[in-house]
Amino acid sequence: NAFLNWFAKTTPGSEGELPALTRAGIAHLYFVCIHPFEDGNGRIARALSEKALSQSIGQPTLAALSRILHGKRKAYYDALELNNKNNEITDWLVYFAKTILKAQSYSLNMIDFLIEKTKLYDRIGSQFNKRQGKVIERMFREGLEGFKGGLSTENYLSITGTSRAT
């Protein structure tokens, strides 16, 4: 109940309102530290962070927080470990704010990627032969990161099911 009471008392517009990133970061750390469930505490903490941020702007956020944290799990767990044993959490809040900025940047880049993908398909999608279509679809599935090391001949042959002679 203490966590829920704190979360309610710090809501935007309330007497105890906190800055958005501060509230979201504290909520995340607080929930992970109390660890009320056997499983899923991290997911719930991320959801609470996103809820806190959404409340501050009055709409859902576009931040791929889970994606960024998953990609840098060791740094995330290290930051939690360093900051869950005392009341000095400035380092955690700095880490969390930087992570949120990365998550927002990733989301914006993903939106741009999807828009450009759609434009490409609208413009020339009907001109692809079957093999080209398979390769383009597979490349797009790799998302922003793309193929590690680029699209090699071996990747192309594997995707299209063709031989080198083709």
Language-model regions, residue ranges each:
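Short amphipathic alpha-helical interaction segments
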Residues: 161-166
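Generic amphipathic alpha-helical segments used as scaffolds and interaction surfaces in large
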Residues: 83, 87, 122-126, 158
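Short alpha-helical segments that sit at the start of domains
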Residues: 111-141
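Phosphate/pyrophosphate-binding active-site loops
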Residues: 1-111
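Alpha-helix termini
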Residues: 11-13, 143-146
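Short acidic, hydrophobic short linear motifs in intrinsically disordered regions
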Residues: 145-160
